[in-house]
């Protein structure tokens, strides 16, 4: 399904270039280091929430979306950890993405979903801004990062999570009367151009 296609795309997009120069120097900068260090815990929390959705979701469509999130973000996590290790071994100092924690969507605790009365709406309310934060982080990487693999991943994050935001907003209108994902910017739902 979509999860398999997205996973195949991620594997294909993340393979190939080793981002080393002719002397074996790592082609990365402080933005790349900041991106990996911020995106790893960001993805970990999304994976935790999606994993919880597999057992708590009331609607099969949300469970399917959560399964897709798990597949794609688990693959991305493996790549992020590998690239982070290479960047750290190269001694590249961490820069700054230029985003606040709120802008990165990191103020959400998946543990809060465990006891949510209306799980599906609570999941949507948490994950839409969380995904918007991932898109902002990916755009910051594209703007200033130089690591080719991370730049490809950022493009994929923008596309995949933009799609997922649109799906969750549709679910929100159907199941939550538009209250769960309301007030969030459409411009953060994927590519703007």
Where are these regions (language model features)?
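Sec-dependent N-terminal signal peptides
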Residues: 1-6
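C-terminal motif of bacterial Sec signal peptides marking the signal peptidase cleavage site
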Residues: 10-13
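All-alpha RGS (Regulator of G-protein Signaling) helical domain and cognate RGS-like helical scaffolds
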Residues: 15-193
């Amino acid at each position: 399904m979509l999860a398999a296609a997205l996973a195949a795309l991620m594997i294909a997009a993340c393979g190939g270039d080793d981002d080393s120069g002719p002397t074996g120097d790592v082609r990365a900068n402080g933005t790349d280091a900041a991106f990996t260090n911020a995106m790893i815990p960001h993805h970990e929390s999304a994976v935790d929430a999606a994993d919880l959705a597999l057992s708590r979701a009331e609607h099969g469509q949300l469970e399917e979306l959560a399964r897709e999130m798990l597949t794609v973000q688990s693959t991305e996590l493996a790549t992020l950890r590998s690239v982070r290790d290479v960047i750290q071994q190269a001694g590249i100092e961490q820069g700054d993405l230029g985003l606040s924690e709120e802008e990165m969507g990191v103020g959400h605790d998946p543990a809060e979903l465990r006891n949510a009365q209306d799980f599906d709406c609570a999941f949507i309310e948490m994950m839409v801004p969380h995904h918007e934060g991932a898109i902002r982080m990916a755009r910051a990487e594209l703007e200033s990062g130089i690591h080719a693999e991370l730049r490809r991943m950022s493009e994929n994050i923008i596309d995949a999570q933009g799609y997922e935001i649109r799906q969750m907003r549709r679910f929100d209108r159907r199941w939550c009367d538009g209250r769960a994902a309301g007030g969030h910017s459409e411009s953060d739902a994927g590519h703007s151009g």
